[in-house]
Amino acid sequence: MDLFEYQARDVFEKHGVPVLGGIVATTVDEARAAAETLTSGAGSVVVVKAQVKTGGRGKAGGVKLARSPEEAAEAAEQILGMDIKGHTVHRVMIAEGASIAEEYYFSVLLDRANRSYLAMASVEGGVEIEQLAVERPEALARVAVDPLVGIDAAKAAEIVAAAGFADDVAGAVADVIQKLWTVYDAEDATLVEVNPLVRTTDGRVIALDGKVTLDDNAEFRHPEHAELEDAASADPLEAKAKAHDLNYVKLDGEVGIIGNGAGLVMSTLDVVAYAGERHGGVKPANFLDIGGGASAAVMAAGLDVILGDPQVKSVFVNVFGGITACDEVARGIVQALEILGDKENKPLVVRLDGNAVEEGRAILAEANHPLVTLAETMDGGADAAAAAAHSAVTA
């Protein structure tokens, strides 16, 4: 479960990680009141930050400085309802401003390849860390973390030294790193990331932004996470998917993906990403696994979720029939399109194979829906869906 920034901030504060004051607002009036609470006089600055589970908020206009409660209200009015990479902004966080001297980066995450944990740190924070890792990999220190030991004082000192932190800030950063490890360990997280971790002009080291992903498999140990999950599912698409017990993850691309089985869906994401490189750089818009034995109703529900995403420009349905029969999938597609009627105009590329494939193809052929195209292979279907999305984006 990915947390919103304001939720990550609250979890940080719970475990002693230094953070600035922040208040969540869902209306303009609430934003104004929050700014009044956080500003202490002339010259006080707050930051109005869109709460969405995607990057690029600043570039999209989702982060604005405000020097008065009225400016905060105006910023909130502009940000609330904004679409950022397909994510609608339903709430903002009004955060205290800070006078920043330096920006750093730190994260700890599950390292599946090595069956361990990995800490990453850099003295160059506040940038796209993926870009930094590619262009200047030496600027990003990577330190393995023993799951049985964690990040104690010695390991924190090793991380700080590997990243090249200056002596005058190394101790404070190491202390914050240990507290961030406590968040990771105590909350059963798979990712804790701070970008930027900052040193202010008065010498404090503060987590200015935060990203936390909690392990859903550890929910039984954390009944308190239920409240976080309810708020984290406030996105209408995620809430709709959850209501139908669909395994859905929103991504930032333009090609909607539906498949049966996590392995097939992951493979489909890869194939669509490769196809997108040939068609203007379009990418997968989501992960959606309808599971084994899915009925026509489940297929229709999944299609309804994906077609409701304004970021999606085309859909690729890739099903290998086993327990899930291809004729049930075909009926679900026809059913969903009948319900949506003229409201929907996004092209669907469908690749069926396996159990009842001929029956499924016959159902779609008989329906003869103008939006549906049948593909013989996964590669061919991915290419057609990527091409359709690119055409829609450039139209």
Swiss-Prot record:
<dbReference type="GO" id="GO:0006104">
    <property type="term" value="P:succinyl-CoA metabolic process"/>
</dbReference>
<comment type="similarity">
    <text>Belongs to the succinate/malate CoA ligase beta subunit family.</text>
</comment>
<dbReference type="GO" id="GO:0005524">
    <property type="term" value="F:ATP binding"/>
</dbReference>
<dbReference type="InterPro" id="IPR011761">
    <property type="entry name" value="ATP-grasp"/>
</dbReference>
<keyword id="KW-0460">Magnesium</keyword>
<feature type="binding site">
    <location>
        <position position="98"/>
    </location>
    <ligand>
        <name>ATP</name>
    </ligand>
</feature>
<dbReference type="GO" id="GO:0005829">
    <property type="term" value="C:cytosol"/>
</dbReference>
<dbReference type="Pfam" id="PF00549">
    <property type="entry name" value="Ligase_CoA"/>
</dbReference>
<keyword id="KW-0436">Ligase</keyword>
<comment type="subunit">
    <text>Heterotetramer of two alpha and two beta subunits.</text>
</comment>
<feature type="binding site">
    <location>
        <begin position="56"/>
        <end position="58"/>
    </location>
    <ligand>
        <name>ATP</name>
    </ligand>
</feature>
<dbReference type="GO" id="GO:0004776">
    <property type="term" value="F:succinate-CoA ligase (GDP-forming) activity"/>
</dbReference>
<dbReference type="InterPro" id="IPR005809">
    <property type="entry name" value="Succ_CoA_ligase-like_bsu"/>
</dbReference>
<dbReference type="GO" id="GO:0006099">
    <property type="term" value="P:tricarboxylic acid cycle"/>
</dbReference>
<dbReference type="GO" id="GO:0004775">
    <property type="term" value="F:succinate-CoA ligase (ADP-forming) activity"/>
</dbReference>
<dbReference type="InterPro" id="IPR013815">
    <property type="entry name" value="ATP_grasp_subdomain_1"/>
</dbReference>
<comment type="pathway">
    <text>Carbohydrate metabolism; tricarboxylic acid cycle; succinate from succinyl-CoA (ligase route): step 1/1.</text>
</comment>
<feature type="binding site">
    <location>
        <position position="49"/>
    </location>
    <ligand>
        <name>ATP</name>
    </ligand>
</feature>
<keyword id="KW-0816">Tricarboxylic acid cycle</keyword>
<dbReference type="InterPro" id="IPR013650">
    <property type="entry name" value="ATP-grasp_succ-CoA_synth-type"/>
</dbReference>
<dbReference type="GO" id="GO:0000287">
    <property type="term" value="F:magnesium ion binding"/>
</dbReference>
<dbReference type="Pfam" id="PF08442">
    <property type="entry name" value="ATP-grasp_2"/>
</dbReference>
<feature type="binding site">
    <location>
        <position position="260"/>
    </location>
    <ligand>
        <name>substrate</name>
    </ligand>
</feature>
<dbReference type="GO" id="GO:0042709">
    <property type="term" value="C:succinate-CoA ligase complex"/>
</dbReference>
<keyword id="KW-0479">Metal-binding</keyword>
<feature type="binding site">
    <location>
        <position position="209"/>
    </location>
    <ligand>
        <name>Mg(2+)</name>
    </ligand>
</feature>
<keyword id="KW-0547">Nucleotide-binding</keyword>
<feature type="binding site">
    <location>
        <position position="195"/>
    </location>
    <ligand>
        <name>Mg(2+)</name>
    </ligand>
</feature>
<keyword id="KW-0067">ATP-binding</keyword>
<feature type="binding site">
    <location>
        <begin position="322"/>
        <end position="324"/>
    </location>
    <ligand>
        <name>substrate</name>
    </ligand>
</feature>
<dbReference type="InterPro" id="IPR017866">
    <property type="entry name" value="Succ-CoA_synthase_bsu_CS"/>
</dbReference>
<protein>
    <recommendedName>
        <fullName>Succinate--CoA ligase [ADP-forming] subunit beta</fullName>
        <ecNumber>6.2.1.5</ecNumber>
    </recommendedName>
</protein>
<dbReference type="InterPro" id="IPR005811">
    <property type="entry name" value="SUCC_ACL_C"/>
</dbReference>
<dbReference type="InterPro" id="IPR016102">
    <property type="entry name" value="Succinyl-CoA_synth-like"/>
</dbReference>
<feature type="domain" description="ATP-grasp">
    <location>
        <begin position="9"/>
        <end position="240"/>
    </location>
</feature>
<feature type="binding site">
    <location>
        <position position="103"/>
    </location>
    <ligand>
        <name>ATP</name>
    </ligand>
</feature>
<comment type="function">
    <text>Succinyl-CoA synthetase functions in the citric acid cycle (TCA), coupling the hydrolysis of succinyl-CoA to the synthesis of either ATP or GTP and thus represents the only step of substrate-level phosphorylation in the TCA. The beta subunit provides nucleotide specificity of the enzyme and binds the substrate succinate, while the binding sites for coenzyme A and phosphate are found in the alpha subunit.</text>
</comment>
